[in-house]
Amino acid sequence: MTETSLGTSNELLVELTAEIVAAYVSNHVVPVAELPTLIADVHSALNNTTAPAPVVVPVEKPKPAVSVRKSVQDDQITCLECGGTFKSLKRHLMTHHNLSPEEYRDKWDLPADYPMVAPAYAEARSRLAKEMGLGQRRKRRGK
């Protein structure tokens, strides 16, 4: 800014301060000792409003590394953040992207039932657990 515009700006602030204080004093009882403080406060408030308003930049939605449809395949699941393929995404998301599965789903607008494990891998794990007898009640001993 040039000195001329600074002077004009400062003069405008003084005029506005005078008008506001005059209007306030005409409708309110203000002790004479508090007038300098009132004038300084109004001038300071007006001076702080001369700063330009911050420009709000719209946040662009991130582009996934692959399409959501192609990210889930039978034998692998692809990370939308980096494009890597995995059998299980949960650990990768936490260690490389610092995201929980819920945060990942929210970030990419995925449904709550979006898998974090490749379907074939989940099926193999399920089959193995059933063969081992996990999830079944144990027989009671000696009664």
From Swiss-Prot:
Molecular function as annotated in GO: DNA binding; zinc ion binding
Zinc finger (C2H3-type): 79-97
One Pfam family, short name: ROS_MUCR
UniProt entry keywords in alphabetical sequence: Activator, DNA-binding, Metal-binding, Repressor, Transcription, Transcription regulation, Zinc, Zinc-finger
Keyword Zinc-finger found: yes
GO biological process: regulation of DNA-templated transcription
Entry keyword DNA-binding: yes
InterPro entries with a match to the protein in the record: ROS/MUCR_sf (IPR041920), ROS_MUCR (IPR008807)
Family the entry assigns: Belongs to the ros/MucR family.
Record's function text: Regulator of exopolysaccharide synthesis. Represses the activation of EPS II (exp) genes for galactoglucan and activates the EPS I (exo) genes for succinoglycan. Also negatively regulates its own transcription.
Name this protein carries in UniProt: Transcriptional regulatory protein MucR
